[in-house]
Amino acid sequence: RNRIVVSPMCEYSSVDGFANDWHVVHLGSRAVGGAGLVLTEAAAVVPEGRISPDDLGVWSEKHFEVLARINHFMAGQGAVPGIQLAHAGRKASTYSGFPGNPSGEVKPADG
């Protein structure tokens, strides 16, 4: 198709690691727009390895079922779908600094 690549962008829009309509529109519109390769955001391979609680996940078959819908749509538009696999390492966090804690500060007792 072409060499235009949509690089992974953290969207922080998943619930329990599942892609949703936001991802369908965000990624699908890039495929419709003509990009040759469209990569998802960083997808955690285990729930404890997420960068944030709102990250995309691929630690269960159910996650792949949802992602397959998006991938089939993008492929139907002529784009090659891809995924960025991720693990945040020893600094991984499933703590959100936003709800009720706008500073994002974690007390030492909490981790």
Please describe what each predicted stretch is:
Residues 72, 86-111:
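Non-globular sequence segments
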